[in-house]
Amino acid sequence: MSKIELSIIIVNYRSWEVLAKCIESFNKYKPNTSYEIIVVDNDSQDGKFESFKQQFSEIKLIKNKGNYGFSSGCNLGSDKAIGEFLLFLNPDVTLTSSPAIDDMYSFAVANPDVGITSCRTLYSNGKREREIAFLSPWLTIGWLRSIYKLAFSIKIAKKFPENKKIW
């Protein structure tokens, strides 16, 4: 058995149709990088697990004991992975070009100090999907504090109608 360079882990919950398109896109735009596809089903309980397993016998299909969330599925998939690198995908991802996976793999090999990377994502109409950053905890606390102060001042203003000015 040759060395697997990349383990592609996909966590599924009742997304069989888009998952099939995802796997078919790997067959259409097959990477040169050696890879395995691992699908972790988060206990969909919709009766489609076995038929999907027969339809895509080339993938590792793992049934989780419950729906413990995306991260649990990723952890279970990575436990079963034998690739040098891990690629986590959502089931609604489809490849649109051949070099996409190979380029990411080459980047990871050439930059061993990089621990995580991503790629450009596009909507199905071809438009670029915007990257979304999470708010820092301090910014979140600041927003919540402002909302609380505003709500509190409105409550106080109602008690004292002559002081209608909130700000």
Predicted regions: what they are:
Residues 1-27:
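N-proximal low-complexity "stem/linker" segments adjacent to membrane-targeting elements
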Residues 34-43, 62-64:
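Short beta-strand/loop segment that forms part of the nucleotide-sugar
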Residues 63-81:
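Glycine-rich, basic loop-to-helix element that forms the pyrophosphate-binding segment
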Residues 86:
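Short aromatic/hydrophobic "clamp" motif used to bind/position activated sugar donors
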Residues 90-94:
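The conserved acidic donor/metal-binding loop of glycosyltransferases
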Residues 96-131:
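Conserved donor NDP-sugar-binding/catalytic core segment of glycosyltransferases
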Residues 137-167:
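Short, flexible, basic/aromatic active-site loop/helix in glycosyltransferases
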